[in-house]
Amino acid sequence: MKFLIKFFLPFLMIGIMSPAFSATLKWSMPGDSLTLDPHAQNEGPTHMVSRQVYESLVTRTVDMSIQPQLATSWTTTDPETWVFQIRDGVVFSDGSPLKASDVVFSINRALSGASDVKELIDSITSVKSTFNNQVEIKTDGPNPILLNQLSQIFIMSEAWSKKNGCEQSQDYDASQETYCSINAMGTGPFVITLREQNTRTVFERNNSWWGDQSQHNLDKIELLPILSLIHI
């Protein structure tokens, strides 16, 4: 049950999940993720799927408080400047290390092109890596809800994205299909091993995850979207 609380309840838990204590969990919800590109669509099912694979600088817990995720700490050096300490020892599911430059790349990607999440962080005027694995974010004025906004911005591997032609977010509204709209590779607790749009998505445990694997006993999650509920 710890897994359900940590990974689903804080994020619009509208699905039906069973059995709770099995190594394989079958998960149903009304509708499917529209895309696997974590910046291409800002809507519930897409975020639900992305959160199993991708992570943010900060996250929300069951009581909706902000907690560290890929950033271990943060501070404001002035009302318009935030400095985030990036967590050491984190690797993407392909084994490559998370770097401050991946965070910079991801935030800039989320701010540009056809990204559907740019409105969430449009107060950001610049983002850069500094020293000691830190990232500095500047805003166009004091922004007391920046942490809440950043909790919805997922961090991608810069190298993986560029290798696969995904430097820019998928243009979902133009029906564009990219490698990153049908594949995913993040730092989260699961990896996607099968993707059948609107039919079935299979997630398997990411053994390289930096978090506490004892928080859940799941080896696999099978998402079976209930498309008929959309029309009720």
Question: Where are these predicted regions, by residue range?
Answer:
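Bacterial N-terminal signal peptides that target proteins for export
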Residues: 1-9
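Aromatic- and charge-enriched surface segment that lines or borders ligand/interaction sites
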Residues: 72-116, 130, 136-138, 146
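N-terminal lobe/hinge region of extracytoplasmic solute-binding protein
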Residues: 28-77, 108, 183-187
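Sec/Tat signal peptide C-region and signal peptidase I cleavage site
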Residues: 16-22
